[in-house]
Every structure is written in C-alpha cells, then in structure tokens.
C-alpha cells in the first residue's frame, strides 16, 4: 500500500481493512506504471488474485481527479455484488450506483453500457475511465460481440476514455492488446496455491465416477472443508446430489445435523411463501440438504438458489452440485472443486469443454483468508483416459480467443441496426469502417492470421447483413444511405433479438383476431424466452392435451410447448406445485418465464402499434398483467392496485367478498388468512380511491 497516494491509502484502508499490503500481482501492475499512466491496460491475473482492487485503485484515481467511471460486468448478480462492495466508498463522498448520470462510479451490465453507447452520447463523453470486468468473455458467443461493439463505439465517441480490462489469462493476449492499444500486466500469483489432478475410477477400485466424487466428499467431511462439483446437466446435478446424500447421511457428525435441517427447512418455506406447496424438486432438494448436499440450477426458485449460496458461504452446506453456468454468475469459492463431466452436448453430439472453461472452474478452488491450498479434481473413467485428460487440460494451453460477432448473426444484425439508428453509420462503407475497428476487424486485417482479403470479407458480411435487414423492413435505403424504419428503431431501443422481433412482426401481420393462447405459444418460440424444461422422459401427453384444449394442435412437444402449457396454467392461477405435477417440468422457474413473457407481450404491442394495429391494445395490456401477476382477469385491479398483495390473497378476497369491495370493512378483511392490519388498511385505501 505504501506505493499508493496517502488519500487513496486512507480510503482503501477504511473500505478494505483486511488488505494490509498489495499482493505480488497487484504490485507488478503498480510497478508497470498502472497508476501514473493514462494508457489502456489489460490486467490478466488468476481468479481471486485481486483484480477488483486494481480496478478500484484506477477508479479512485479518476474520481479524485474529478472524473467519472463506468465499471461494466456481465450479469445482474455480479452488478449487485459489486455495488454492495463499492457502497463502502460512499463514506468518503464517492457516489456509487447504476446510473452514470448520478454516480461517480456507475456499475453497469454489458448490455446497459452497450445501450448507453448507442443513444446517450453526452453521458458517454463525460466518462473518463471504462473498466471492463470479466473481459475474457470477449470470446463468448452471446456477450462477446456486445463487449467488443460497445468498446468500439465508446472509443469512437470518446477517444480520450481510458480502458482498463480485468481478465483471466488468454493465450493471444498480445493480439487483444494490439486491438485495445493497451499495455498488458500478466502474473501467475494466486493467494492460495492450486493443486490440479485427474482422478479415475481405477485408483479407488470403483466402477462409477459418482463414487470417485463420493471419495472426495468423504475426505472433505473429514477435514471440515467444502466442495463444488460441476456436472453437465440439471438432471445430473440432482442425481449426483441424491446419490451422495444417500451415501453420506450416516456419516454426518451430530453437531452438523441440526444446521443442515435448518437449511432444508428454509428452502421448503420458499414455495409456501408464494402460495404453493413444495414441488417434488423442492422436496428432493430438502432431502439432499439434510445430508449437507445441495444441487443448484435454473429450475429452482431464485430465492432457493440465494439460500444455497448464502448457506454455502456460511459453511452450512458440504457440497453444491451445479452446472458450469454457476462459474459465471456467483462468487462461490471452495477448498475443493470436482469436475465430473468434461463434455457437453452440442448439435454435433458430445464435445469436450474448452481448456478455458476447465481453468475457470478449477480457479474456484481455494478460498483466500481461509485455505492454505485449493484442490481441483477432474474425474476420468480409466487410467488411460486420465492420462489423456491430464495432457489435454492440465498441461494444455488455453484456446486462442476469437471474435464471435460474425458467427452470432443476431449480434451482427443488432450492431448494424444500432449504428444506423443512432446515426453513426449510414452506408455499407461506414458500417464496414465500424466493424474494421472491432476486435473482429482487427483480427481480420491486422491479427497474426489476417490476410489481404480481410477488408473485403468485412464488406461482404456487411452487405449480406444489410440486405437481410432491408428484406425484413428494418432498414431502408435512401439517397444518402440507410435509415432505420420505425420497426428498426424499436429493435434498436429494445434488448430483444432481431429474430424475436421478426417472428412477432410476422405473427402480427397474419393475426386477424387476438388469440392469447396462440400468442403465448408464439412467444415461447422466440429466442429471448427463458424456457421451462421437462424433468425427465415421462409422457409429454399432458402438455399436448393442454395445448389442444386451447386450439393448439401440435405433434412435436418440447420445452417450448411445455413453457406455453405452464404459462397458460399460470395465468389461470395454478401453483408451481400443480404445474410441476401436471406436466413433469421444472415449474419453479415459471415465475421468471412469466415475467419475461409479460415484457415480450408489451414489445409485441409496440410492434402492433407501428403496424397501425391498435384494436388489440387493451387485450395485450390485460395479458401482460396476467402473466406478470399470475392471475385471472378479474383479479388484475386488486393485485395492481394494492402493492404486495399477491395473487393468493387477492383470490381469497374475491372469493369472500366478490369484486365490489367498496363496503367491506377493515376488520372483515383482517379475518382473511394472511391479511394483517397494515394490508387491510392498504386495501381499504385502494377501494376508497377507485
């Protein structure tokens, strides 16, 4: 810390009292001129090695000099985590928030920052420092194109902005640094040494990989540590957790039994608090938790996932079995990481996970301040396979990071629309110039694998994409270049994919009368809709039958159809328990799917308006509300008008008193289960107003 200015040392000492000295990786950055220089920097150091503190040091320097900072992250969960961490700075007069207009340090998700670069140029031009956390995601299919395009626009509109990229180590760092015009600080320091090993069934004389995981768990139980186990699918998270819980339950020390039961009780309370009995998935989770094992996937209630994460941090869970998506969204280090599955299913069949993903999962092992070492175990079926995996993953090199902006066609279309709608590009030449400045363009024209046809390739991709957008009436050509149609402007100002917009536009053009059930089904077929998935291979006839009841005759039944059936039941006030039992789906995610469907219905309404179709507006507003609140039409005024009432209590009120509540007294309302004096008063005030 001695190398930092006194005022900065004071702030950091107050906000991060556990940090006494900079670690070797942080010192190497300071010694490389990171604090004094205005150059762009890529900080490439391992997980948990202090990247965030280096970001804060740069941010403090900028704010102390009167500047503004935007700190970008990939996910809302990380945004909330960072804001909570940075709030300590407010004690020193530094404003922290999500809005760059009112914050000295604004924490934004990538998509929000991308939107800022399109339409909020004045704000962007006031930003002095852009910090890009999890920058290594620039090679990821979905978010990578967003990162590189937003950075490119930001540098075009505000050439003086300084960029600090916080990243894992990438194999082609020099190439990436060339694009960013950045200096690179790489260091292999880890606060907790990491031991990586491949285990196989033959070592332990067992037949199944699950039994190898059990051996690791038993060792963790002996030394009082915790384990994260990664598998490839939701179903495997549950089957592994159940297997381990069954095997370990008789070996749990008495002093742990009660705390495990308390955690199990907490997850069972979640559906009850939402008016639903626990689903079979909830019951299975609670049963596993009584043995200290949790499974973690998107098919659980959000609150249940939060409980699992918090209790794991507090040491009240021995092991979490999870899919690899956990490594991106949640900061959950543990002493031991087990990677049971090293393949994932693709359209071409099973494929090995990248070395980069293996590194990210392994990097979770070892908790700073708690562990003297971290242990990562990859599981193989045989000794020969173990040797192969050791060569591939432990000794192998991380793959070269490449731009995905052309591979992800929707990302290409969205960035072209953004450029045209914002007035930054109007011709194919100007669009090609924009893409020339992206990471994709740098790799095509200046990278080590570039060739003399790089610019021609960019021009070709742009021309193909603009033709597609003109065919779909998103762009139209004029004497001075392209302009965005009303439809194109709507897409540019939304967060929806071009494919979603085109599908909904097509449906609106073919629709004579409003059929809300057909609309729900069409929404589930858009790529922006989070789907509710089947739990196993049980009969799918109940889903087919439910859709047939509402005039939807379908031969093939998959997750899209399951989601449509679940949403139809949701707006008819069925509980998650009833939906799961009826259709054999992960119904805990119904609420999230319904929320997203509600927003897509509003987007569909805007599409109808720009097409001049207004006769469905009222029905669409009603459907959006029904999806959002999960109610029949008669309950909408009550759940909308009385904040926090919820659909269960609203239905009890309507059943008891009918829809006309003008003459119902507060004492009568309080007789209904779940309604206390405060809520009764709120209901009366609502009735008096309306």
Swiss-Prot record:
Ligand binding (ATP): 26, 45-52
Keywords per UniProt: ATP-binding, DNA damage, DNA repair, DNA-binding, Helicase, Hydrolase, Isomerase, Nucleotide-binding
GO molecular function annotations of the record: 3'-5' DNA helicase activity; ATP binding; ATP hydrolysis activity; DNA binding
Domain Helicase ATP-binding: 32-188
Pfam families noted in UniProt: DEAD, Helicase_C, Helicase_dom4_arc, HHH_2
Helicase C-terminal domain ranges (all copies): 208-417
Matching PROSITE patterns: HELICASE_ATP_BIND_1 (PS51192), HELICASE_CTER (PS51194)
SUPFAM superfamilies: P-loop containing nucleoside triphosphate hydrolases, Sec63 N-terminal domain-like, Winged helix' DNA-binding domain
Top-level taxonomic group: Archaea
GO terms for biological process, alphabetical: DNA repair
Location of the motif DEAH box: 133-136
Effect noted on mutating residue 434 to A: Strongly reduced ATPase and helicase activity
Family: Belongs to the helicase family. Hel308 subfamily.
Subunit structure comment from the entry: Monomer. Binds replication protein A (RPA), in presence and absence of DNA.
Annotated function: DNA-dependent ATPase and 3'-5' DNA helicase that may be involved in repair of stalled replication forks. Helicase with 3'-to 5'- polarity; able to unwind over 100 bp of DNA at 50 degrees Celsius. Unwinds forked DNA, preferentially on lagging strand forks; has weaker activity on Holliday junctions. Displaces the invading strand in DNA D-loops. Unwinds short oligonucleotides from dsDNA with 3'- but not blunt ends or 5'-ssDNA tails in an ATP-dependent manner.
HAMAP family assigned to the protein according to its UniProt record, in alphabetical order: Helicase_Hel308
Protein name in UniProt: ATP-dependent DNA helicase Hel308
Organism: Methanothermobacter thermautotrophicus (strain ATCC 29096 / DSM 1053 / JCM 10044 / NBRC 100330 / Delta H)
Lineage: Archaea, Methanobacteriati, Methanobacteriota, Methanomada group, Methanobacteria
Gene from which the chain derives: hel308
